[in-house]
Amino acid sequence: MQSWSAPAIPVVPGRGPALRLFDSADRQVRPVTPGPTATMYVCGITPYDATHLGHAATYLTFDLVHRLWLDAGHTVQYVQNVTDVDDPLFERAERDGIDWRTLGDRETQLFREDMAALRVLPPHDYVAATDAIAEVVEMVEKLLASGAAYIVEDAEYPDVYFRADATAQFGYESGYDRDTMLTLFAERGGDPDRPGKSDQLDALLWRAERPGEPSWPSPFGRGRPGWHVECSAIALTRIGTGLDIQGGGSDLIFPHHEYSAAHAESVTGERRFARHYVHTGMIGWDGHKMSKSRGNLVLVSQLRAQGVDPSAIRLGLFSGHYREDRFWSNEVLDEANARLARWRSATALPEAPDATDVIARVRQYLADDLDTPKALAALDGWCTDALSYGGHDTESPRLVATTVDALLGVDL
């Protein structure tokens, strides 16, 4: 599947420090320790509606990771999926009287356009779930053969389920107790009360064919993949074991990332699917989490149509820490536009203060769990000094603009 065009990335003199990130499984900030090639899997969209700022905040966060790895001298293998076969897509297509494939293609293309406009570096592999059916089938076969999965006794719909107790470590990624798991499982696409399951927390691997739904052949009957196993299969076949980062929004901690990890660990025997599980906070509007179901979305495409500079969108989202739940507002956008204007004015000066210290601090702040508020404040200080007092360094305006472009993805 085609992704989107990559923006040019300038090179900042020197090399960035090693990255440290909060790991949701270990509940602490600790070093990320990739080899020469850093690997990252980030869960992609279910394309039944346009890209909102909650999506943008997540993909901008991992764009920072991508950029910082490049700045530190790594090659990056980044994989992202598209969940182009799932219940929300079918429901929206039926509501709108459109074929689900047409809807998925349309919204995926809009997502590509939004990501390109936001100057997000594209993934190395951009994989639709419908292009990974063979990998999913193979993985489900292995899980069935090992006893980690079973087929429910249902003559009409013999679905395949994963045993939540298939791995001794199940639950380590989220750290949630069983009651919390059951609540979130029911709220986020699970089916705890499905008759025939061995345990309420057993998760769907393969949904047997239903009338009006797409299906594919498999040794265990026609059907379609469950949500979690798509990501497990795509990540293992594109990257393999020892994934450096599994990433997504905090609403994916459970059940999605817990089960994706458990599926992969059951197949490979590895203790941990990913070395780091990294999650972004939710973006709200009008006092509530921004979500399609609530209908309070601020769409990237709408902001672009209104003439909002994509660099201002980046700065607005970077004004808060990536792990925090935070709110978007007109005030946030106004502040981002003002900051962008100041930075552009300062970096357009013929001379300015020396930039060595500010570049080092920006690198250090970003490497320390993506502390964008401190990085932005450091740049604000340099720009204020440049505009208020001037300087004598003819290279520093260009170097600061290069740093902002390369590390923050903001075009000055």
Curated annotation (Swiss-Prot):
Cofactor (UniProt): Zn(2+)
Annotated function: Catalyzes the ATP-dependent condensation of GlcN-Ins and L-cysteine to form L-Cys-GlcN-Ins.
Enzymatic class: ligase
Name recorded for this polypeptide: L-cysteine:1D-myo-inositol 2-amino-2-deoxy-alpha-D-glucopyranoside ligase
Entries under InterPro entries matching the protein: Cys-tRNA/MSH_ligase, Mycothiol_ligase_MshC, Rossmann-like_a/b/a_fold, tRNA-synt_1_cat_dom
Enzyme Commission identifier(s): 6.3.1.13
UniProt motif 'HIGH' region: location: 45-55
Motif 'ERGGDP' region, residue numbers: 187-192
Subunit structure: Monomer.
Protein family membership: Belongs to the class-I aminoacyl-tRNA synthetase family. MshC subfamily.
SUPFAM superfamilies for this protein: Nucleotidylyl transferase
Effect of residue 251 to A: 1200-fold decfrease in catalytic turnover
Source taxonomy: Bacteria, Bacillati, Actinomycetota, Actinomycetes, Mycobacteriales
Motif ('KMSKS' region): 289-293
Co-factor binding details: Binds 1 zinc ion per subunit.
Residues the entry annotates as binding L-cysteinyl-5'-AMP: 43-46, 58, 81-83, 227, 249-251, 283
Organism: Mycolicibacterium smegmatis (strain ATCC 700084 / mc(2)155)
Source taxon at top rank: Bacteria
Any single GO CC term annotated in Swiss-Prot or TrEMBL for this entry: cytosol
Effect of residue 46 to V: 100-fold decrease in catalytic turnover
Listed GO MF terms: ATP binding; cysteine-glucosaminylinositol ligase activity; cysteine-tRNA ligase activity; zinc ion binding
Keywords: ATP-binding, Ligase, Metal-binding, Nucleotide-binding, Zinc
Pfam short name (any one): tRNA-synt_1e
Chain residues that bind Zn(2+): 43, 231, 256
Catalytic reactions of this protein: 1D-myo-inositol 2-amino-2-deoxy-alpha-D-glucopyranoside + L-cysteine + ATP = 1D-myo-inositol 2-(L-cysteinylamino)-2-deoxy-alpha-D-glucopyranoside + AMP + diphosphate + H(+)
One of the GO biological process terms: mycothiol biosynthetic process
